[in-house]
Amino acid sequence: MTDFAVDDGGRLAGAARGRNALALAIFLLTIAAFLLRFTISPEVLDRFENYTGDGGSFLQKLHVGTYAILLVAPLALISRPIVLRGDEIGKFKALLRFVLLLVGLMVYLGLVGHISTSGIFIDTYLAAGVAGLIMMAQSEAARRRIGDVIVVMLLVSALMGVFEAVTHHRILPYDNVEAQFRPIGLTEHPLALGTLCAAGIGFAMATRWPVWARLLAAFVLLVGCAVSGARFALLTAAVEVFALLLLTPWPKLTRRHARQAKAVVLILVLIGGAALVALLASAGLLSRFGDGVFDANAMVRVSVYDIFGHVGWQDLLFGMPADALVEVVQKQLHLPTLESAPIAILMLLGLPMALLFVGALGWTMLRVLRFARASTRIALLTFFVAALSNNALSTKTPAVAIALVLVLAFSNREAAKSAPDRRG
């Protein structure tokens, strides 16, 4: 009997070690896949393959990080049991339905001959949905560690942006020619750097880092947003800072003491913010604000609505290929890019499919936000408000995936476990 007990114990210990090794492997592969998608810009990828240029096979038009995420997904979802409780089941179902809807959308685009359009939705939204499913397959500790890694990535990007703004030398390749130098950090565009830094402030405050580390991270991200030249993103970041201060609970203080403490901190933030603006302006890092917020570049986002005079009703109902849309924007409207996510999604998908897609995206985001901390909610709202001012939602970017991964990383999982599952 003793020998059998020892054998059983050895087998159980060996099985436990095997499960731990598999969990660690999936965790590391997940981080590697996410970082591939989140840090390799289109300009870098173009050095190795024809990712954004004309011609080439469709397989070349998908990001290497997207392939990595799609390869990790079966391993994370099938290789071991997934333990979901309470409201987590509803979140998993919501993400799965969103992914299936996108697969159906890809089939639709292929049937109507708009295969070039599908690359945008695969790289931006399908990869984000699959990344969300991978996150749901992780343990609570693994999710939070992944979130910490992504926040550190945003901090590195912000610090790179500050270095680039000071030295006027970009670390990564950037092919666009601009009248004024703007840093990009680890992103593909200065506006993307500003958007992610702005949203990252709230996500940094949602971590479990020491208070001083969270405040330092928020400060670095705010400076990164400021030097990026993304004016609207900086305005949303400023509003976000006040929202985080006023709307997030301070559980270790009574309500009365919390109000008093917030009033003192608010005064300090106003003084510190004024000093920061003066310092950055004196260093010439806020030159983009010299012409105000609504200059010629900002008016491009208004003049893009003239596109309705250059397309037919068939385009409005059934959409148009991505290359045809670019041709209209550049040759008819004489604009370099289409920096309007609503117009881009409408013209790429057509009105019925665009309404279906936007509704599904909004519903999915609201569903995964359930039981998220106030700082996480504020961060996601900041992200979408800032992203709507540029093309982060309508081109092949990792921004949506980054936001979704961070929301799932910093959700209140204990509350989700105890809550009953709801339909949807």
List PLM regions with ranges.
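Aromatic-anchored transmembrane helix interface
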Residues: 94-106, 113-137
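Hydrophobic transmembrane alpha-helices and their immediate junctions
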Residues: 84-89, 96, 264-265, 348-387, ...
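Alpha-helical transmembrane segments of multi-pass inner-membrane proteins
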Residues: 147-171, 188-248
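Hydrophobic, aromatic-rich transmembrane alpha-helices
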Residues: 24-27, 69-86, 198-207, 351-370
